């Protein structure tokens, strides 16, 4: 049976070659040149790959290894992409999208993606908000000490909920104001959990990461220990490598 190929990412030619690295199923990572582009791949040993943590990390490891070797301009491909032949890739991707691919590479050249995820502790923030806002505190106390009608209960609950949402957005805005001016592009993603209040990716010049990291730390420090921040400064540019 003919080999099938698992694809990791696309690079401007000549791209990486002879990476001393194994990909999924411990298969050797190889390079295939198609016109102005180079594809990193390995032989696919499965009909389809489950999106397990091991497989996802294996996919990402290949791209990070190429980046570490200096091949920083790349288009990561979605996990699980398997093709039957290079003719299929040429016909379905390279030929119809070569100009779009070239424009994406031009946009990404000299840039890196960094991401930030910010979490808070809702109960702590609620207590802080109540301590700061006498009106809301009085409304909450009404809920605890007075027999109220359903409409009043709903109204007070909505007031507290709206105030918490405004507080959440106020924190997110401080990150936006500090970080957006340092980026060439920004993409905000939906929060992944109930306690996540900000989730964004930034496309920044490669050499400006230290400045960006310092800006993240400065905003974090302004909130003392109230927030939990996950900052990733080394990843393939998944958020900014989308074909139109």
Please annotate each region the language model reported.
Residues 1-230, 234-244:
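An interfacial alpha-helical scaffold signature
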């Amino acid at each position: 049976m003919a080999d099938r190929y698992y694809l990791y990412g696309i690079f401007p030619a000549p791209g990486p070659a002879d990476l001393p690295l194994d990909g999924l199923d411990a298969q050797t990572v190889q390079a295939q040149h198609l016109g102005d582009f180079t594809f990193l791949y390995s032989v696919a040993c499965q009909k389809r790959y489950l999106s397990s943590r091991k497989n996802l990390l294996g996919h990402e490891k290949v791209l990070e290894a190429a980046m570490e070797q200096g091949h920083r301009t790349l288009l990561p491909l979605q996990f699980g992409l398997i093709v039957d032949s290079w003719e299929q890739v040429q016909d379905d991707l390279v030929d119809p999208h070569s100009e779009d691919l070239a424009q994406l590479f031009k946009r990404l050249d000299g840039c890196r993606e960094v991401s930030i995820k910010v979490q808070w502790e809702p109960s702590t923030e609620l207590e802080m908000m109540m301590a700061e806002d006498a009106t809301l505190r009085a409304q909450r106390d009404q809920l605890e000490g007075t027999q109220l009608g359903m409409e009043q209960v709903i109204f007070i609950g909505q007031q507290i909920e709206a105030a918490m949402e405004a507080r959440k957005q106020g924190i997110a805005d401080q990150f936006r104001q500090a970080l957006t001016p340092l980026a060439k592009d920004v993409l905000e993603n939906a929060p992944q959990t109930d306690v996540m209040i900000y989730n964004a990716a930034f496309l920044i010049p490669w050499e400006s990461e230290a400045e960006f990291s310092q800006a993240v730390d400065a905003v974090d420090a302004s909130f003392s220990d109230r927030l939990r921040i996950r900052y990733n400064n080394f990843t393939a540019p998944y958020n900014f490598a989308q074909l139109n």
